[in-house]
Amino acid sequence: MANQTLTFEIGTEELPAFALHAATEKLGGMFADALDGAGIPHGEISVYSTPRRLIVSALAVPEATEALTETFRGPAAKIAFDADGNPTKAALGFARGKGVDASALERRDENGVEYVYAVKSTPSVQVITLLPDILQNLITSIYWPRSQRWGSRHEHFSRPVRWLFAMHGDAVVPVEFAGLTAGSTTCGHRFLAPGPWEVASADALIDVLREHNVVPTEAEREASIREQVAAIEEKTGLVAELPAKTMAEVVNLAEFPTVMVGEFDELFLAVPKEITVDAMLVHQRYFPLFNADGTLANKFLITSNGDPKFEANIVDGNQRVVAARLYDAKFFYDEDLKRPLEDYVERLDTVVFQEKLGTTRAKTDRIVALAKAIAADAGATGQEAADAERAAYLAKADLVTGAVVEFTSVPVSYTHLTLPTNS
């Protein structure tokens, strides 16, 4: 029997980045379990993913399963049959458990004791007849934090499924799902090479995708992004901040990532860099750029999934987006500076810390008491003790400022950013 590669692709609308990563990590194991459960031998399994597709591929999948004969020893014959030779409950239960008829049980002598045996024969089956159900079940078994239905369909998936590709060697596996039947065509990059594109065999799918502007693995897309960022850093003399969490999301937002440089008005540099960086990283998935001395530059990196020919338009659109976000940040920061931090402390009464422990204002009083006790134990007096008490009093004031309400990852540093100016 010839062994062939089996490749299955689920083509979709853009999948959520973190959910896609989680599904990618589990898909290989799920596929292996499904093949093993059906008695289908296979070689190495590979998983590929982009925002618009999940692909799983297994090497060395045979055309047919092997014919199998299994022999199972059961209870002693004197227990399995009564005096008249009729099967007892023990024999009936054993036969039922092994999937054979009690009349087919055999008696065999073993060291002077007669036992009953069940011989179970499983014929060879063409693998391509088993695969449609296996692959359909694989689709429905993928876990998504949130799923949706589309059109008039009852099936659900993380995002609408638009095409299916399934081939074993050069034979199409007719998997059906959500009104679609798998074929031998795939789609390339949505804008650069949409397709559809004919694929000659299961082995050829990944090469066809690469030829049509699809980078099929997270690792390759991340390497491409980092290489492009390094080239920009060398050209500009600036340094990019590439947090792992943001990078993990960005690699699953583009099938063919192109890194571009955007710019914002220098007036936003007056806003604490923590707020500006938060606005870019957390809210827009832009990578900030810093000068060699560590100060924030008025430039940022865009990871685009669009056509590089339209870079000017893409950059302009993203600059408009970041400008709107930074105008908001500057507005909230400027408004926060109009009042001393002490004014915000009393508003902490509106923030519940924990139902049984009261508000954050009550927590502030406890922090102040702790600060006094620690200062006294440390022998602090005069200005040192007063500074400790004041720091404790203001520690949570930033939680009700406009900037922190709008940019929720900022509070760890926002108090010290505003303190020199407005207190």
Regions inferred by a protein language model and the residue ranges of each:
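Metal-dependent catalytic cores of enzymes that make or break cyclic nucleotides
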Residues: 403-412
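Conserved small/polar residues in nucleotide/adenosyl-binding loops
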Residues: 415-421
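Alpha-helical scaffolds flanking conserved acidic
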Residues: 381-397
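Glycine- and acidic
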Residues: 9-17, 117-121, 210-214, 230-235, ...
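Catalytic nucleotidyl-transfer cores of nucleotide-processing enzymes
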Residues: 161-162, 175, 241-359, 365
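Long, basic N-terminal domains or extensions that often function
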Residues: 2-266
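Inter-helical turn/loop segments and adjacent helix faces that build the functional surface
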Residues: 236-237, 374-384
